[in-house]
């Protein structure tokens, strides 16, 4: 009984503390709102700490933009405040502010003139350190969900009424042939599918074109052993989560089947067997003319918005080594690798040392193939178990059981400014290096050249900066440590009739050469489909401008050209991993919906082009 009284007292004290903290935060939000409503920029900016960050996902800027420091915040407010008219800043329903290590954190809601928003604020010493504001929905153009979901059935007597299937068939037969889509998405992988699903729920006429025969074939057609290296909790699509018994790491064919199912149940207008041939922008009509070939027949589409969702791994980067035309054996890019089965008893050289190279080498070894990896530059490796532990607070079964939702996890991750993210990641990877010291020592003894990024900030920063240069270890590293997969470090001088010659004179005999040499930027597709001039106009896609390897400066603060307006009106890029495809599809779809409905979308801070395609 005495313990019960102690527990009750502690619970009461915690409740009072939460109530007091909530009251303080709401008073702070009220003061912030009053300054914004009054247009008092001095008062509003003074509520931010000297080091501060405001990341806005569409709500204020109609852009994806991070303001770093008080001066940038003042400039944004000076430009956007009159149009946005933000108000009703509140602690989010069923949420309470929390305090730890001198930082108060709180989920918030707010409104603008045209939208409702959600955000996350962090205070230090009574001032804003980080603020995330995101657009959730457009007023008057909300998704039909929950209480407003479609009825589906037509009850009562309705002479001549069409069934759901008849209406769906009619739409399928007309869109793109008798009526035009407002949005055309080129690429039907997870990026195009996630965006298509969002636009479908928002009532925006959209067609997704995919060159493969079935949805999901972009996964099915990859090498046999491919599985996702990200865990299931990180990889949900919008609206439909994976079942609770879904494997932690999804095999490629299972993901392919899920994507195919998803396109059907989400009622996407998905054209398979369709290749985009050419596109032109008509500035007078503000529309695109896109010629596609569908099942051998050319069709001309006239969308207002064109989205490239061709993927980070869709345009193979095939090297041009001297002597490739003389090789007597089989050679192909890793994207065309059929799997290991037909190579048993042969010698295979895999040029490259990132994810695909490791996966292919491991599968070849397991199939009884004599396989050698050629490492041309350093590679960052992190064990899958260690990576999962580092994100377990957001994406794990433990996180789910603790009340963490996918949407919240995404927003927490999005709320961390890129400018300081490397500082937050470095101690994570310092610990991983310490915990996995024996693992890394074994790789070093085997001759593997390791890195942890230019500033030791690890996997996520390397991915965000360049999208390459790493391997999430699911077993291949031990094969290298044990010498079962042979490793050679060096640069390729030429391909000979019988193998590979390195600059140090070493000869590697080969029956098969696999070029696991990565992929080029998505705007390479712009050059192919539209023109080189257009690709140069929009500039490089991906990267932060961190001035690290393969991510030249100046600092951009956000991913170049991704999920936001580009220098070409009506041209957009969408993609990334499953997490990014899910999360950012929300904000790209709202930008497109607003334009479809004629909602004013004055873009603040359109990204200048510093690097051509």
Label the model's feature ranges:
Residues 22, 34, 38-100:
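A solvent-exposed, acidic/Ser-Thr-rich amphipathic alpha-helical stretch
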Residues 99-110, 288-290:
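A short hydrophobic beta-strand element
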Residues 155-181, 332-345:
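A short, basic/flexible loop-to-alpha-helix module at the beginning of a structural domain
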Residues 213-241, 379-402:
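Conserved N-terminal glycine-rich FAD pyrophosphate-binding loop of Rossmann-like flavoproteins
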């Amino acid at each position: 009984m005495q313990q019960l009284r102690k527990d009750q007292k502690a619970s009461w004290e915690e409740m009072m503390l939460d109530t007091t903290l909530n009251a303080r935060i709401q008073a702070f939000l009220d003061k912030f709102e009053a300054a914004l409503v009054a247009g008092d920029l001095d008062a509003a900016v003074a509520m931010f700490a000297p080091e501060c960050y405001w990341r806005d996902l569409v709500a204020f800027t109609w852009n994806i933009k991070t303001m770093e420091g008080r001066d940038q915040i003042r400039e944004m407010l000076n430009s956007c405040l009159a149009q946005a008219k933000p108000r009703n800043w509140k602690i989010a329903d069923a949420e309470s502010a929390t305090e730890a290590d001198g930082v108060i954190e709180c989920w918030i809601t707010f409104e603008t003139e045209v939208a409702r928003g959600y955000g996350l604020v962090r205070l230090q010493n009574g001032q804003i350190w980080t603020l995330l504001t995101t657009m959730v929905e457009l007023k008057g153009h909300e998704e039909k969900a929950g209480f407003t979901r479609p009825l589906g059935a037509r009850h009562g007597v309705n002479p001549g009424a069409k069934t759901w299937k008849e209406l769906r068939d009619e739409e399928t037969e007309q869109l793109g042939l008798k009526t035009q889509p407002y949005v055309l998405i080129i690429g039907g992988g997870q990026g195009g599918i996630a965006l298509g699903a969002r636009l479908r729920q928002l009532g925006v006429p959209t067609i997704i074109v995919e060159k493969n025969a079935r949805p999901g074939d972009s996964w099915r057609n990859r090498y046999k052993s491919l599985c996702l290296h990200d865990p299931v909790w990180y990889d949900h699509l919008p609206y439909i989560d994976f079942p609770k018994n879904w494997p932690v790491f999804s095999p490629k064919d299972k993901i392919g089947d899920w994507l195919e199912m998803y396109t059907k149940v989400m009622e996407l207008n998905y054209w398979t067997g369709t290749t985009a041939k050419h596109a032109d922008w008509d500035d007078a009509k503000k529309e695109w003319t896109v010629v596609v070939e569908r099942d051998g027949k050319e069709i001309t589409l006239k969308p207002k918005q064109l989205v490239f969702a061709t993927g980070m791994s869709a345009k193979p980067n095939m090297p041009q080594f001297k002597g490739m035309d003389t090789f007597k054996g089989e050679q192909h890019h890793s994207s065309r690798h059929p799997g290991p089965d037909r190579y048993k008893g042969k010698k295979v050289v895999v040029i490259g040392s990132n994810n695909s190279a490791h996966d292919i080498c491991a599968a070849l070894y397991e199939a009884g193939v004599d396989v050698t990896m050629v490492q041309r530059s350093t590679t960052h490796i992190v064990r899958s178990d260690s990576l999962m532990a580092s994100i377990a607070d957001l994406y794990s079964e433990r996180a789910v059981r603790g009340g963490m939702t996918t949407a919240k996890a995404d927003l927490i991750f999005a709320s961390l400014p890129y400018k300081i993210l490397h500082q937050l990641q470095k101690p994570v990877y310092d610990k991983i290096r310490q915990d996995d010291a024996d693992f890394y020592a074994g790789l070093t003894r085997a001759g593997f050249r390791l890195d942890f990024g230019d500033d030791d900030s690890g996997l996520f920063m390397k991915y965000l900066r360049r999208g390459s240069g790493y391997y999430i270890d699911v077993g291949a590293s031990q094969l290298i440590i044990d010498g079962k997969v042979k490793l050679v470090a060096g640069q390729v001088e030429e391909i000979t009739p019988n193998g590979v010659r390195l600059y140090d004179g070493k000869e590697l005999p080969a029956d098969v050469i696999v070029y696991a040499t990565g992929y080029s930027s998505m705007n390479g597709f712009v050059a192919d489909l539209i023109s080189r001039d257009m690709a140069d106009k929009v500039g490089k896609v991906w990267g932060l401008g961190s001035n690290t390897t393969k991510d030249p400066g100046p600092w951009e603060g956000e991913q170049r050209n991704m999920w936001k307006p580009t220098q070409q009106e009506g041209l957009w890029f969408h993609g990334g991993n499953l997490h990014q495809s899910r999360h950012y599809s929300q904000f790209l779809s709202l930008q497109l919906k607003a334009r479809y409905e004629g909602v004013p979308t004055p873009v603040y801070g359109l990204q200048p082009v510093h690097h051509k395609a």
